[in-house]
């Protein structure tokens, strides 16, 4: 999957993956990470997610990474946030008091840009990658996240042959097999959410499961 795919989606505003409200699973499970209020939280492939506003409201310093510049600009403008922009070697750094977003490729994001990170939140990043690219993303996430950082991961799983992603199906088996090298994994919840997702119902997907994980970066 090439960057042009996502740029075209944002240019056409075909952004069905964007939620118009804070993710209820974030609200329900975030406190289980037991973070200090001033913790810095990394949000990969953040888009213009309102989840970042929720995290900032908890007192966190939010650090996002997003490929598409329009998505970043819309986040700040739609939330009436004044921002500064700094040009870096590989990214543009958009900044306001509690939310900083690096606009550019996550694979070229330097770990030196996030030395204070102690937590992360992935709702739409892991499931955005087809299987042949997903492991490379997981390895990059592990590279960026300091040891002992804690994170909340939300995944979707369904019969991949029944629907073309994104979002792509990520099974519990895949999570356990491919993330356990770098993270301690605890599945907090797993629910049938087919009836809540009309696109999947319309495409006659036979089942759809949403899972929530608590991850801790190994030392």
Curated annotation (Swiss-Prot):
Residues the record lists as binding S-adenosyl-L-methionine: 10, 45, 66, 123
For the protein in the UniProt heading, the enzyme class is transferase
The principal location of this protein is cytoplasm
Query: What EC number(s) does the entry state?
Result: 2.1.1.67
Q: Name one GO molecular function term.
A: thiopurine S-methyltransferase activity
Which terms does the UniProt entry file under GO BP? methylation; response to metal ion
Q: Where in the cell is it found?
A: Cytoplasm
Q: Which UniProt keywords apply?
A: Cytoplasm, Methyltransferase, S-adenosyl-L-methionine, Transferase
Q: Which GO terms describe its cellular component?
A: cytoplasm
**UniProt cross-references to InterPro entries, sorted A to Z:** SAM-dependent_MTases_sf, Thiopur_S-MeTfrase_Se/Te_detox, Thiopurine_S-MeTrfase, TPMT
Which reaction is the catalytic activity of this chain?
S-adenosyl-L-methionine + a thiopurine = S-adenosyl-L-homocysteine + a thiopurine S-methylether
Q: Which family does it belong to?
A: Belongs to the class I-like SAM-binding methyltransferase superfamily. TPMT family.
Q: What is this protein called?
A: Thiopurine S-methyltransferase
């Amino acid at each position: 999957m090439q960057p042009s795919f996502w740029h075209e989606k944002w240019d056409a505003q075909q952004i069905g993956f964007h939620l118009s409200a804070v993710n209820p699973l974030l609200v329900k499970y975030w406190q289980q990470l037991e973070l200090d209020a001033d913790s810095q939280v990394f949000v990969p492939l953040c888009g213009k997610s309102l989840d970042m506003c929720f995290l900032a409201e908890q007192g966190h310093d939010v650090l996002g990474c997003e490929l598409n510049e329009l998505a970043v600009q819309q986040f700040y403008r739609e939330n009436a946030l004044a921002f500064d922009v700094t040009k870096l070697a590989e990214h543009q750094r958009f900044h306001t008091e509690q939310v900083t977003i690096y606009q550019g490729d996550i694979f070229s994001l330097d770990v030196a840009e996030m030395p204070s990170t102690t937590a992360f939140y992935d709702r739409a990043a892991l499931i955005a990658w087809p299987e042949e690219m997903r492991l490379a993303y997981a390895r990059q996430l592990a590279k960026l996240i300091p040891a002992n950082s804690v994170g909340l991961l939300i995944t979707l799983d369904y019969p991949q042959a029944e629907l073309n992603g994104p979002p792509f199906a990520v099974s519990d088996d895949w999570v356990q097999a491919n993330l356990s090298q770098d993270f301690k994994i605890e599945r907090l919840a797993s629910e049938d959410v087919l009836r809540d997702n009309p696109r999947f119902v319309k495409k006659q997907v036979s089942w759809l499961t949403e899972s929530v994980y608590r991850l801790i970066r190994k030392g």
